[in-house]
A protein has these predicted regions:
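Interfaces that engage single-stranded nucleic acids at replication/repair/recombination sites
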Residues: 1-30, 123-224
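OB-fold ssDNA-binding interfaces and closely related basic DNA-contact patches used
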Residues: 1-6, 13, 28-53
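Short histidine-centered catalytic/ligand-binding loop motif
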Residues: 22-34, 85-92
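Positively charged, aromatic-enriched nucleic acid-contacting surfaces
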Residues: 40-183
Length: 224
């Protein structure tokens, strides 16, 4: 069973979802996070272990919903289990929490763990891509998806291309010839300066190159 666990493949581009992580208050840019759908976990479990050789069980502990994901070990003739807790969904509370717990338990088995090795993803946005939500914060019309992804032997992400729903490349990482679409933006700072040409390119490169929240806040301060 250990060999089977090690044979769990990295996720395909079509199996990965892009969701907004953070967005600048003025809507001029956002970060993206890579996610997997619970159906991906089920598909890979069926592929690697077989439909009859895994099972899931949910328990409520201190008000939290846990998922126990068990795999049948044919050599030991016993079930081997890994568990994790889910977080609530903003829409369907119980269903979302159960799905999240299942996906987290799948992470513990190695399904989609490579998503944690990805680069920080920053997307500059155009004004017509953003609208004001009911809460008053900026929200996106544009949807993003993974066009291409590549891994090394350690199952770490070494190539990543993200496109929008108009099939324009909005982010590229690694050894790729894809040309990233340059949004028609003009970012003004407090003194009224407008970033264009070389200055705009430099600002965008700084945004797309950050790798931590602290670095992101520093770049935001430089290009408010």
């Amino acid at each position: 069973e250990e060999k089977k666990k090690n044979s769990i493949r990295p996720l395909l581009a079509s199996e990965i979802e892009c969701r907004v992580g953070t967005m600048k208050p003025d809507g001029s840019g956002c970060s993206l996070l890579l996610y997997k759908d619970a159906r991906v976990d089920m598909r890979i479990l069926d592929e690697v272990f077989g439909e009859m050789n895994w099972k899931r069980h949910h328990d409520v502990v201190n008000g939290n919903l846990f998922c126990t994901l068990s795999i049948w070990d044919n050599e030991k003739k016993e079930w081997v289990s890994k568990q994790d807790v889910g977080t609530e969904s903003s829409t369907e509370k119980e269903k979302g929490q159960a799905s999240d717990a299942f996906k987290r338990a799948g992470f513990n088995w190695g399904i989609g763990r490579e998503l944690y090795t990805g680069p920080f993803i920053w997307i500059p946005l155009e004004k017509n891509e953003v609208y004001q939500s009911k809460t008053g914060s900026p929200a996106l019309y544009t949807k993003f998806s993974v066009k291409e992804i590549g891994y090394n032997e350690q199952k770490e992400i070494i190539l990543l291309v993200i496109v929008d729903n108009k099939n324009r490349v909005r982010f590229a990482y690694g050894n790729t010839k894809e040309k990233v679409y340059a949004p028609n933006v003009s970012a003004s700072n407090a003194s009224g300066k407008v970033y264009t040409g070389v200055d705009l390119d430099r600002a965008i490169k700084q945004m797309t190159g950050v790798k931590s929240r602290e670095e992101l806040e520093r770049v935001w301060a430089e290009h408010p």
